[in-house]
Amino acid sequence: FIKSKVNFKNINSYLDVGTTEDEHHESSNYLNKRFDFIKKHNSISDQKIKNNRFSNILQKTITGNFSQNEIDTLRSDFVISNATIEHVGSFDNQEKMIDNMIKLSNKIIVIQTINRFFPIETHTKLPFLHFLPKKIHRIILKILGYKYYSLEENLNLLSYYEMRNILKKFENKIDYKIYR
């Protein structure tokens, strides 16, 4: 899908936000494995990444503060986050993540996440429960034994409208399009 929407002709560097250390699943770092035509790959992750595909790796949360040196080292033409924004915690942290991605981008930012109102929640595989108000959803997840996912800091799904509202705050910095 991304290759059909983005012109990669002048993309020379790539930044993967939220890289996982897990390389055992086909979905792990899926996009990074498919962008081998881009010369320089960079990574930001709160995990320790041992992967020789990356030119630069910064072990840091994407919601943190970045020094000018870190920004200069990691700034890339194409910055992508695949299934990360729902794991950074609060709405404020989600905003901070996007703000940092803008600072780290020369040209293009892609944020991929599951829509909160997709019928099956992909982390728990439970249908429709996540349609409930977030507070009730979290209580039920905890009762069902999904304590990790019941905490906002570990899972905070966004609806189309919530994502749009975050992006509207950056209209003076970026042009954006949301695909459903």
Regions found by a protein language model. Give the residues of each.
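Short, glycine-/aromatic-enriched active-site segment of Class I SAM-dependent methyltransferases
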Residues: 123-127, 134-153
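Short alpha-helix
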Residues: 149-171
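Conserved SAM-binding loop
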Residues: 5, 12-118
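Alpha-helix C-cap/termination motif
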Residues: 8-9, 103-104, 169-173
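Conserved S-adenosyl-L-methionine
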Residues: 172-180
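Conserved class I S-adenosyl-L-methionine
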Residues: 108-136
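Conserved SAM-binding loop and adjacent beta-strand
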Residues: 1
